[in-house]
């Protein structure tokens, strides 16, 4: 999710294990990307005494060729392999039938270790926000990062699926605090984050240090908002919350709000934001 959003041309795995051991890893990768998948296994694992790898060229080719059945388009070898291994793999692949992948990826966001699929209502914890919270404002002014982390841990324990992060306060350097907070949060929780700010530079700084696919909160129908927020969303492969309001405020009629929502969707899609 993260790499495809960032514009990678292909994703995959190399080294670490032999071809048989990498099959479940590759199966999972294929579930979550529409990009070409690359696989370069080791020739098994090295013997600790001889440093020789335990999979022969023919065994390697027989096992690695199974990846073509998963729709893998790029195959090679890593540690322990040699031209002899690649020759055996090429010969084996010439007799195999490549199976094209059909992937239907749901809307989802992720951290470095946790994916939240947006296929039903999700709980977003909103406690990391100074609005109406005197103690939180004090924590921001005093650079009390531990208090902020405590709020994250409590919300995770209470069942939040995603954590909103807002550190906007007139008396502080919001950009610096946002970067510090996002980095620190990733050390105590694996929940995906929602970056919440009205300042484009703050949003981009947060996405720059975030290890995953975040949500941006938010964009609206104002031309200025569309022109400044959506390019950042596109650049970092984020998801984004769209607010049905514009230069004239919040429309009273549902039909007018729908038109704003459609405007946001059309602009996002024209930029290649899914």
PLM features: residue spans?
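Domain-level signal for soluble alpha/beta catalytic cores
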Residues: 1-274
